[in-house]
Amino acid sequence: MLYQTENQHGGDVYGGGITLDFSANTNPLGTPPGVLEAVRRGLPQLHRYPDPYCRRLVQAIATHEQVPASYILCGNGAADLIYTYCAALRPRTAVELAPTFVEYGAGLAQVGCRVERYFLHQAQNFDLDEGFLPFLEEKKPEVAFLCNPNNPTGRLIPLPLLEQILQYCAAQGARLFLDECFLDLTEDGVSAKSLLAAHPELLILKAFTKSYGMAGIRLGYCLCADSALLRRMASASQPWNVSSLAQSAGVA
């Protein structure tokens, strides 16, 4: 078999045998009609290379997120940006939650990073609490990976706690990678993007996959005020990594 390891994710409807899949939590309403139409309109342009800088898409995201366009880097899905971030930084030490999304650890493993895990407990409803702060003090990581809401527990991290974590990172010269890919599907979730300008050590991950039912398109983006980091990530990624159809879908 070509692939040496088993796929760790759900959503593999192609091998047969899946009746109900609770792991692929995309928008149950499906892909918006306007996105489907934008993809159809883009088909005649397939003979051309896609825009390597995603210019129209970046401007559309900047308007939607109300952040400067210079804060935005697009990628071939959220997972692509996780691996690009790890490749650009090549941290020696990192922390993540347990349980959480497996691709953080996989991306860090590819660059030989030592990962420490902060375990969440059912007795506390799997909530992240202020006990994470002394854990950071003890482990002194170069980067912390958090997911808000956490995947797979679905629990939100309060914004005041995120601010405390960022204060620690700023004081210690560490970074915070914050995955907000599921945030739009929550009722009470508050994005940390208001903290970007004051905290260049913060990078927020977003994707079209969940909110817009676009898992097959592969389109994600990140927000960060550290332009030097975004340039390093762009240099670590492959050219033309966001297809023209994905860009058209994202603009729509």
Model-derived segments and their meaning:
Residues M1, A87-L146:
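PLP-dependent aminotransferase-like
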